[in-house]
């Protein structure tokens, strides 16, 4: 029996030497058998379950993070303190500048002026000073007209000028025939109609314009007709006097 076994082994060795493909196949089969031994189904199940358990334990922190993120996105049972604790710390200077290093517009905005901080005494003094200047201008207007026309105007200067008669006589006194036709009251009709008053006022303003009074210093018709713009009228009359004085100096 021993001799027969040795003969069989020698025969197999000769066959393997003559057929190298068979040798490589046997070697690969033996390697497979050696590296991957066959085990029972129960052992494989236990190994798989153990492997799955290990994977489950290793991946459980990731799942918890995903669950926390899901709760945070849904806004359910996630307190602001937890969000603040989990969120990364941001320095105060991180948001001080916008893209490309530009500062937000709020940096350039000036603080709103507090109206309550204005001194009421200053407001009253400024108002009184303005009223004093206007009164002086109106008195100067009265003196200029009375001195040139040699008349005494009514105490209510606005009522004395509203029909435009005095103003037309003033411009004709400065430059004769500047206003060709003047509507004047008569004993029968002591008060002119509004249409005639407007015509006198418009003729006066047109004469001032022709004599060289700048447009920005010309008052409007309603400043005279409605007796609400004596300061504007005073500016117009003063400009008219200044223009005529300047022209007389250079002629």
Curated annotation (Swiss-Prot):
Protein's cellular compartments: Cytoplasm
Entry GO CC: cytoplasm
Modified residues (Phosphoserine): 87, 91
Residue span of region Disordered: 73-97
Compositionally skewed regions (Polar residues) per UniProt: 88-97
Domain Calponin-homology (CH) per the UniProt entry, residue ranges: 131-244
Record SMART domains: CH
Keyword vocabulary terms for this entry: Cytoplasm, Phosphoprotein
Residues annotated with Phosphothreonine modification: 123
Pfam family, one: CH
Source domain of life: Eukaryota
Complexes and interactors: Interacts (via LRR repeats) with unphosphorylated DOCK8 (via DHR-2 domain); the interaction prevents the interaction between DOCK8 and CDC42.
Primary role: Acts as a negative regulator of GTPase CDC42 by sequestering CDC42-guanine exchange factor DOCK8. Probably by preventing CDC42 activation, negatively regulates CD4(+) T-cell migration.
Protein name according to UniProt: Leucine-rich repeat and calponin homology domain-containing protein 1
Species of origin: Felis catus (Cat)
């Amino acid at each position: 029996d021993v001799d027969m076994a040795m003969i069989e082994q020698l025969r197999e060795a000769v066959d393997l030497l003559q057929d190298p493909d068979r040798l490589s196949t046997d070697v690969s089969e033996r390697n497979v058998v050696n590296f991957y031994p066959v085990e029972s189904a129960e052992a494989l199940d236990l190994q798989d379950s153990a492997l799955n358990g290990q994977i489950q334990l290793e991946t459980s922190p990731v799942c918890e993070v995903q669950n926390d993120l899901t709760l945070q996105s849904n806004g359910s049972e996630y307190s602001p303190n937890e969000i603040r604790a989990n969120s990364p710390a941001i320095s105060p200077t991180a948001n001080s500048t916008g893209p490309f290093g530009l500062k937000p517009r709020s940096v350039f905005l000036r603080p709103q002026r507090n109206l309550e901080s204005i001194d009421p005494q200053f407001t009253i003094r400024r108002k009184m000073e303005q009223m004093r200047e206007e009164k002086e201008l109106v008195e100067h207007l009265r003196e200029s007209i009375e001195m040139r026309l040699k008349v005494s105007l009514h105490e209510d200067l606005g009522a004395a000028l509203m029909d435009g008669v005095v103003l037309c006589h003033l411009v004709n006194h400065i430059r004769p025939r500047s206003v060709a036709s003047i509507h004047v009251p008569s004993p029968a009709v002591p008060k002119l109609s509004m249409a005639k008053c407007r015509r006198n006022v418009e003729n006066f303003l047109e004469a001032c314009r022709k004599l060289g009074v700048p447009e920005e210093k010309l008052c409007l018709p309603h400043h005279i007709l409605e007796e609400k713009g004596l300061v504007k009228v005073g500016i117009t009359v003063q400009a008219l006097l200044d223009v005529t004085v300047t022209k007389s100096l250079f002629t």
